[in-house]
A protein has these predicted regions:
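Histidine-acidic metal/acid-base catalytic patches
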Residues: 1-36, 99-101, 157-179, 183-261
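Active-site-proximal loop/turn and secondary-structure-junction residues that shape catalytic pockets
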Residues: 16-18, 44-46, 70-73, 109-111, ...
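N-terminal substrate-binding region of glycoside hydrolase catalytic domains
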Residues: 29-46, 68-73
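Conserved beta-strand positions in the central sheet of alpha/beta enzyme cores
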Residues: 41, 66-68, 104, 142, ...
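Active-site-adjacent beta->alpha loops and helix N-cap segments on the catalytic face
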Residues: 46-56, 113
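Short hydrophobic interaction/assembly module
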Residues: 54-81
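Active-site acidic/histidine proton-transfer and metal-coordination neighborhood
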Residues: 59, 78-176, 186
Length: 261
């Protein structure tokens, strides 16, 4: 683990981190702020008390880096696009309330009987329309490829290269890539290679070690090399800590600091 890791802005994903911070989800926000984090993120807002979230965020003065636009569905299927776009409208309103910078967009699962290129093109159409909505709200959209080998069997968008091709077709500067280093490595990608032509296209980043999806330092990722590749892509935003801690949150963070030092 390079000392460089701790020079990045870090954004804990509160679905897994600070789960030991209190009985209610807003307590996780307070615990993260107490630990010195100025940015946090989570998966979805629809299963949470938004008023309580908003109060905790305002109280702690934190920024939400990202949460998932709902409903998720299958944007590989054009028949779902109206529902998806209505969800983006609602999610943008929530994002403004919660001081969120980005909405995460997922492709949904593959349609087995439909040509792959047609599904990829359908994502581009949906993102172009969603991007227009998000731009009016001042919110970014980030498209996330996921691994299909371990965690998300059947998911359509498993390749960083394909995600970048879709984003180039969309051509909106506020519709960018959510690069998840863990998912990328699990899919056998070389981060330096897939990020080589991604300058200006990475809107957010998630990290966890692989194998295992635990805190950095517990797996086999060459962190110095991969963080250098990320810097070379022009990305200088937050690293979302989306890992399953092998110990309590504070202990896992202390472990990262210890091996980074």
């Amino acid at each position: 683990m390079p000392p460089d890791l701790l020079s990045w802005q870090l954004s804990p994903c509160l679905e897994w981190l600070f789960a030991d911070g209190g009985a209610e989800f807003p307590d996780r926000i307070r615990a993260a702020a107490q630990a010195g984090f100025r940015q946090v993120e989570f998966w979805t807002a629809g299963n949470k008390d938004v008023a309580h979230l908003e109060a905790a965020i305002d109280e702690c003065g934190v920024t939400v880096t990202a949460f998932v636009s709902e409903p998720t569905g299958r944007i590989v299927d054009p028949s779902t696009h109206n529902m998806f776009l209505e969800g983006v409208e609602r999610s943008c309103s929530l994002a403004k309330r919660l001081h969120a910078q980005n909405l995460i967009v997922v492709s949904g699962d593959t349609l087995p009987a439909v040509d792959r290129r047609a599904q990829s093109d359908a994502i581009a159409v949906a993102l172009d329309q969603a991007g227009a909505i998000a731009e009016r709200s001042g919110v970014g959209l980030v498209l996330e490829p996921l691994n299909t080998r371990v965690d998300h069997a059947g998911y359509f968008l498993e390749s960083t290269e394909e995600a970048l091709r879709i984003l180039r077709a969309v051509g909106r500067p506020t519709v960018r890539l959510l690069y998840d280093l863990y998912h990328s490595v699990v899919m056998g990608e070389d981060p330096a290679t897939v990020l080589r032509d991604a300058r200006g296209m990475v809107g957010h980043v998630h990290i966890a070690d692989a194998p295992g999806r635990h805190e950095p330092g517990t797996g086999k990722i060459d962190w110095r090399r991969e963080l250098d590749a990320l810097r070379a892509s022009g990305y200088d935003g937050a690293l979302g800590l989306e890992y399953v801690p092998t110990r309590g949150t504070e202990s896992s963070l202390a472990f990262i600091r210890r091996i980074a030092g």
